[in-house]
């Protein structure tokens, strides 16, 4: 009876570990290839606009500090 309980506990812990690691991997892949990360990359292309001056960039940095 003790070995069955230990085996059941071991399987539950193993199941929890695999589901947590799968969620971590999917979350990491979602951050890399997800819609939100692509949108954030699109906003960065405006920093290379030649019409922006150094003062404009400094103002943008101040605005985006707490965003």
Curated annotation (Swiss-Prot):
<dbReference type="GO" id="GO:0005576">
    <property type="term" value="C:extracellular region"/>
</dbReference>
<keyword id="KW-0165">Cleavage on pair of basic residues</keyword>
<keyword id="KW-0027">Amidation</keyword>
<dbReference type="GO" id="GO:0016020">
    <property type="term" value="C:membrane"/>
</dbReference>
<protein>
    <recommendedName>
        <fullName>Amphipathic peptide Tx348</fullName>
    </recommendedName>
</protein>
<dbReference type="GO" id="GO:0042742">
    <property type="term" value="P:defense response to bacterium"/>
</dbReference>
<keyword id="KW-1052">Target cell membrane</keyword>
<keyword id="KW-0732">Signal</keyword>
<comment type="similarity">
    <text>Belongs to the non-disulfide-bridged peptide (NDBP) superfamily. Short antimicrobial peptide (group 4) family.</text>
</comment>
<keyword id="KW-1053">Target membrane</keyword>
<keyword id="KW-0964">Secreted</keyword>
<keyword id="KW-0472">Membrane</keyword>
<keyword id="KW-0044">Antibiotic</keyword>
<feature type="signal peptide">
    <location>
        <begin position="1"/>
        <end position="23"/>
    </location>
</feature>
<keyword id="KW-0812">Transmembrane</keyword>
<feature type="modified residue" description="Phenylalanine amide">
    <location>
        <position position="33"/>
    </location>
</feature>
<feature type="propeptide">
    <location>
        <begin position="37"/>
        <end position="67"/>
    </location>
</feature>
<dbReference type="GO" id="GO:0044218">
    <property type="term" value="C:other organism cell membrane"/>
</dbReference>
<comment type="function">
    <text>Amphipathic peptide that has antibacterial activities.</text>
</comment>
<keyword id="KW-0929">Antimicrobial</keyword>
